From Swiss-Prot:
Organism name: Mycoplasmopsis pulmonis (strain UAB CTIP)
UniProt KW keywords: Ribonucleoprotein, Ribosomal protein, RNA-binding, rRNA-binding
UniProt protein name: Small ribosomal subunit protein uS19
Gene (UniProt): rpsS
Gene Ontology biological process terms, A to Z: ribosomal small subunit assembly; translation
Protein family: Belongs to the universal ribosomal protein uS19 family.
GO cellular component, one term: cytoplasm
Length: 91
């Protein structure tokens, strides 16, 4: 379900402060965040974020196509181990 237009997009304040600081200092250092729920704004383009997936941090380089999506969409939380293998087929 989409967010109401009258509410507007959401991003955590502490993340916006980190982004402003990175833009001012022209730092190429990744911005570490646990805020998977934050929307990607146009200001975030060409910045690298380290998004927490519950276990470790995944590097996410933001491009133009990602604007409007959430940071968490680009850091998968589940790993697929494959389906159970049939023991009878094994030779």
């Amino acid at each position: 379900m989409a967010r109401s237009l009258k509410k507007g997009p959401f991003a955590d304040e502490h993340l916006l402060k980190k982004v402003e600081k990175a833009i001012e200092s022209k730092s190429r250092k990744p911005i570490k965040t646990w805020s998977r729920r934050s929307t990607i704004f146009p200001d975030f383009v060409n910045l690298t974020f380290q998004v927490h997936n519950g276990k470790n941090f995944i590097d996410v380089f933001v491009t133009d196509d990602m604007v409007g999506h959430k940071l968490g969409e680009f850091a998968p939380t589940r790993t697929f181990g494959g389906h159970g293998e049939d023991k009878r087929k094994k030779k």
